[in-house]
């Protein structure tokens, strides 16, 4: 037996040192992307000052990054079925490298924005990593490895954002992109060395660019509709224009997929109980639970009259850091557990616990020990159980003929769901009353209940993992 054979299972999947090396390489790839999201936020005021623009203008540094993240998540993930996961990871790293160079040497905001757009395309690193793990590892190893990768989604427990602030204060915002380039270079050699050489493209046809562009327009314009409606006005002409463009994009996508020889995702697959319930589950889970942790409780806790009167830093320490840290610890364990208990069953457990915790918060919003305890429960139930299994199910339930289709579409729903939830509850959660917080919580509970209902409708394909 060769050394290489010793690191392969009986069914040809990776194990041992080769598996560890692959997971490490993929972790570096997703960290390279994630640092662009988490480290840059503290540097926005410094960027505005150095480039001579307003803080409002420099907010495009984040919004454009997220916009192109939606585009990359859909197109690049599905395109990897045709050109290979390895090639698309190299393309992602190339975009990160060039985008970071442009950011380092930018002398004006437009040049920096071009760099940020290129960096945003790399959001597909998460979905492609999940697909690679599913194809290279056995079912049980896949779950554990996916949990490890999922734990990095959203940052490294807040440490990366803190380091970003320190680097900006000491060396300026350009130092952040130098750090990112270092990670990109290490990631490149990691993928070069650890990626399985025998992994071939999953699809042999021709990518449906027309369908891909249509669904991307629909998703992006829907996201802009939600953002513009909540920040400007739901009746503003631009908001209405985004809604019309989103509807047109989805209609054109539907019509295109009906006649496409090799669709992005077929209409029959969309109608199946292994696809639409997951898309709905992702959308409603994020819309229901994300705003509770990241907005409702944070805003209420800083209200000195009816809330807990906390400072911004204390509020973060009580309500943002615990669920993030708990999620990082819980995600790998959930990934290990889900293949044994069942991916869909694990998701249902997580959503049920989310609903229980949210109902308790709604009933006792002014009881600090109770609310903090429920936030800890949400750290396990939402950050750990729900997010890990939703990411895993995107791969596990994806149709065999188009493995990248469901991760691409469901991945886009993560951002849409969180934006939708924030838009729906923010008018109530921010009105400075206990009744407003309770109303926001009731809305969140109803949406999360819809996510649980969607999980009850989920079914794996015959003979597949569930």
Enumerate the predicted regions with their spans.
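Conserved MFS/SLC helix-loop-helix module at the cytosolic interface between two early adjacent transmembrane helices
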Residues: 70-108
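Paired small-residue
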Residues: 95, 99-102, 110-118, 369-378
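Helix-breaking motifs and short loop linkers at transmembrane-helix boundaries and internal kinks
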Residues: 50-52, 84, 104-111, 138, ...
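Extracellular/periplasmic helix-loop-helix junction of adjacent transmembrane segments
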Residues: 41-71, 109, 313-314
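Cytoplasmic helix-loop-helix junction between adjacent transmembrane helices
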Residues: 117-151
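Helix-to-loop junctions at the C-terminal end of transmembrane segments
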Residues: 72-85, 168, 329-343
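Hydrophobic transmembrane-helix bundles of small-molecule transporters
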Residues: 169-281, 288
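12-transmembrane solute porter fold
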Residues: 19-32, 40-41, 55, 237, ...
């Amino acid at each position: 037996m060769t050394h290489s054979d010793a690191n392969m299972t009986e069914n040809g999947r990776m194990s041992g040192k080769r598996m560890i090396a692959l997971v490490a390489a993929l972790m570096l790839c997703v960290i390279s992307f994630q640092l662009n999201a988490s480290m840059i936020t503290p540097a926005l005021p410094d960027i505005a000052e150095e480039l001579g623009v307003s803080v409002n203008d420099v907010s495009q540094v984040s919004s454009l990054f997220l916009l192109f993240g939606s585009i990359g998540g859909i197109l690049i993930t599905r395109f990897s079925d045709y050109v290979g996961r390895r090639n698309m990871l190299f393309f992602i790293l190339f975009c990160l490298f060039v985008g970071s160079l442009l950011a380092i040497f930018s002398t004006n905001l437009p040049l920096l924005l071009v760099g940020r757009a290129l960096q945003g395309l790399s959001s597909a690193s998460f979905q492609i990593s999940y697909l690679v793990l599913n194809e290279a590892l056995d079912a049980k190893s896949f779950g554990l490895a996916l949990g490890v990768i999922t734990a990095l989604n959203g940052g490294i427990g807040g440490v990366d954002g803190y380091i970003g602030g320190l680097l900006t204060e000491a060396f300026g915002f350009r130092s952040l992109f130098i750090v990112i380039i270092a990670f990109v270079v290490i990631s490149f050699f990691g993928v070069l060395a650890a990626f399985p050489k025998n992994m071939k493209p999953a699809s042999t046809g021709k990518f449906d660019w027309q369908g891909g562009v249509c669904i991307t327009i629909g998703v992006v314009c829907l996201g802009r509709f939600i953002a513009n409606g909540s920040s400007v006005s739901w009746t503003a002409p631009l908001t209405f224009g985004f809604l019309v463009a989103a509807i047109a994009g989805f209609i054109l996508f539907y019509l295109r997929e009906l006649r496409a020889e090799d669709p992005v995702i077929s209409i029959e697959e969309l109608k199946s109980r292994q696809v639409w319930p997951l898309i709905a589950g992702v959308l409603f889970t994020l819309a229901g639970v994300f705003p509770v942790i990241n907005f409702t409780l944070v805003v209420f806790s800083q209200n000195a009259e009816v809330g807990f009167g906390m400072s911004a830093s204390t509020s973060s320490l009580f309500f943002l850091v615990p669920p993030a840290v708990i999620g990082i610890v819980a995600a790998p364990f959930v990934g290990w557990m889900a293949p044994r208990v069942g991916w869909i069953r694990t998701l249902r457990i997580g959503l049920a616990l989310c609903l229980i915790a949210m109902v308790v918060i709604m009933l006792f919003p002014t009881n600090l020990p109770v609310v903090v305890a429920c936030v800890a429960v949400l750290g396990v139930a939402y950050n750990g159980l729900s997010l890990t299994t939703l990411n895993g199910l995107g791969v596990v339930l994806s149709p065999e003929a188009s493995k990248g289709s469901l991760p691409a579409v469901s991945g886009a729903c993560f951002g849409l769901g969180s934006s939708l939830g924030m838009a729906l509850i923010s008018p109530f959660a921010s009105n400075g009353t206990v009744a407003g917080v309770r109303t926001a919580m009731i809305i969140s509970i109803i949406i999360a209940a819809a996510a649980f209902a969607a999980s009850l409708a989920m079914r794996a394909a015959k003979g597949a993992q569930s």
